[in-house]
């Protein structure tokens, strides 16, 4: 087999971009403790071991796809933190590969710039290392736009099937698909209207479509079957299929009421809010922020395909700005189209001057993203003063969980240790201790029937109430689970943990 080194050399920049992206998303992947949401997602995947399927809940605001991906990853590789995060990492890297495919429409320089900006983006790296749904939604949103442009420019059947498959996967991922699909659809009449005051150049008329009615029936028929398959819990719970439309009432209510996630400090006029723009500026998402400005260029006569992307991107940003519910990881659903727009403007400017001038423009932008991204992901990943660090579990949790897991892994009988966790909010602990069979979880209004447990966790404010009930010697470990939660105290039975922790018990009951 002969290797075409000339062809390989031509693709070296793309290979380098992907390798950098993989490194930033995989290196020290378990350095950051499991997030609250990761614990919930992992717990849902764990329940599939008991029930055999994922029982869809329309009030959970997330589709079933990520839970099945996590279940598969943990089944293949074990219940490890890196395995929990592996599906999201895969989706994040595939998103970069998908952006590179836009060279078919916008040329290689624009596609490479967009992919490199995503590879280095602090947000895409930070949340690409989280086991949450958003990375999947980004991937499928990119593929939907790719399919739309493909149908527009070539009309090929493959783009019809890609469109159906990508929309289906968006629906399976998160209810915000309505927002993204809505923006893509509404951008069409806006594009058609705007051509009158500002004619496009070039216009790119709709290509002759090569697909048939049978292709449409096949593509969307298969999509419907796939949706029913996953939402019905692999055909085991058909009543859950109604959640496909029931979820939107709950999602709309949460989106408007915000549930403590509103960002009123950034309000402008009425429902308008500049939180996302402020986040781009604060968190070194400068390529995307300049991409917002670059999008204004397409108000003037310009390539109608870029104009369509600009309208869609602006509509998505506007929609997320109006919605009251704002969590920082949603930003990755908005950034990527602006990379394409900035790349297009840079490519246009450089073509009129000198290609080397590109690096004088691009390097400071990407260097800022890389600097902050490395600092955020590998040094200050639990610092609450950082906007992307949001209800993140503190490293303190390891002071409690590591001794428990160490004892359990050294002796299989350790997974039979009894525990009582008495916290109002205790995730990600149920996922961390998912292999233990005798742990009870209690809220502030309930207590265990006895106190003779191998480990106990309480709010520190209840120490004086709980300690008189302890009948064994315990080591006392204070820790903070996350911001917004009171300090916690863990009690580890001395007869189980004294050697592991390496100190004498703090509490010794009187005979």
Task: Identify the residue ranges that each predicted region occupies.
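Membrane-proximal, lumen/periplasm-facing interface regions of secretory-pathway glyco-
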Residues: 251-252, 358-437, 484-509
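Aromatic/acidic, Gly/Pro-rich catalytic loop(s) in extracytoplasmic/lumenal soluble domains
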Residues: 451-511
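Loop/turn elements at helix/coil->beta-strand transitions in domains of secreted/extracellular proteins
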Residues: 175, 415-416, 436, 451-454
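A short, well-structured beta->alpha microelement
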Residues: 433-450
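Flexible, charged surface loops at secondary-structure boundaries
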Residues: 220-221, 408-414, 446-453
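Short, hydrophobic beta-strand segments that form beta-sheet elements in well-ordered domains
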Residues: 419-423, 441, 456-458
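Membrane-integral, polyisoprenol-dependent glycosyltransferases
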Residues: 2-356, 363, 367-368, 376-377
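Solvent-exposed loop/turn segments at secondary-structure junctions
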Residues: 317, 445-447, 461-465
């Amino acid at each position: 087999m002969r290797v075409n080194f000339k062809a390989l050399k031509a693709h070296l920049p793309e290979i380098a971009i992907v390798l950098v992206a993989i490194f930033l998303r995989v290196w020290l992947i378990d350095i950051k403790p499991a997030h609250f949401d990761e614990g919930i997602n992992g717990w849902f995947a764990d329940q599939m071991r008991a029930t055999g399927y994922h029982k869809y809940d329309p009030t959970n605001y997330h589709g079933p796809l990520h839970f099945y991906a996590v279940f598969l990853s943990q089944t293949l590789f074990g219940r490890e933190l890196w395995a929990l995060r592996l599906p999201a990492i895969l989706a994040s890297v595939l998103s970069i590969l998908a952006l590179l495919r836009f060279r078919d429409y916008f040329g290689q320089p624009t596609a490479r710039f967009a992919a490199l900006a995503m590879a280095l983006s602090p947000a895409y790296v930070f949340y690409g290392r989280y086991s949450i749904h958003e990375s999947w939604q980004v991937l499928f949103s990119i593929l939907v736009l790719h399919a739309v442009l493909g149908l527009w420019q070539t009309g090929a059947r493959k783009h019809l099937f890609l469109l159906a498959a990508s929309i289906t996967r968006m629906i399976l991922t998160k209810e915000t698909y309505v927002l993204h699909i809505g923006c893509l659809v509404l951008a069409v009449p806006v594009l058609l209207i705007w051509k009158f005051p500002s004619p496009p150049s070039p216009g790119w008329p709709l290509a002759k479509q090569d697909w048939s009615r049978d292709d449409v029936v096949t593509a969307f028929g298969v999509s419907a079957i796939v949706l029913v398959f996953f939402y019905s819990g692999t055909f085991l719970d058909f009543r859950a299929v109604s959640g496909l439309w029931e979820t939107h009432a709950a999602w709309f209510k949460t989106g408007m009421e915000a549930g403590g996630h509103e960002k009123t400090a950034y309000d402008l006029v009425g429902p308008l809010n500049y939180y996302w723009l402020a986040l781009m500026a604060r968190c070194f998402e400068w390529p995307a922020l300049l991409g917002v400005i670059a999008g204004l260029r397409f108000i003037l006569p310009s390539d109608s395909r870029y104009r369509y992307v600009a309208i869609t991107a602006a509509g998505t940003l506007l929609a997320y700005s109006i919605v009251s519910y704002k969590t920082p990881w949603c930003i990755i659903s908005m950034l990527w189209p602006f990379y394409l727009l900035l790349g297009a403007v840079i490519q246009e400017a450089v073509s009129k001057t000198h290609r080397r001038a590109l690096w004088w423009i691009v390097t400071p932008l990407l260097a800022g993203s890389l600097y902050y991204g490395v600092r955020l992901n590998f040094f200050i990943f639990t610092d609450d003063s950082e906007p992307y660090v949001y209800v993140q579990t503190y490293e303190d949790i390891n002071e409690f969980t590591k001794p428990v897991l160490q004892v359990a892994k050294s002796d299989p009988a350790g997974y039979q240790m009894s525990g009582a966790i008495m916290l109002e909010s205790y995730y990600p602990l149920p996922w961390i201790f998912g292999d233990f069979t005798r742990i009870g979880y209690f809220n502030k209004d309930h207590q265990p029937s006895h106190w003779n447990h191998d480990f106990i966790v309480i709010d520190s404010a209840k120490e004086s109430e709980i300690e008189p009930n302890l009948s064994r010697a315990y080591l006392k470990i204070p820790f903070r689970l996350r911001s917004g939660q009171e300090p916690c105290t863990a009690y580890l039975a001395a007869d189980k943990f004294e050697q592991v922790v390496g100190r004498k018990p703090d509490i010794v009951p009187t005979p």
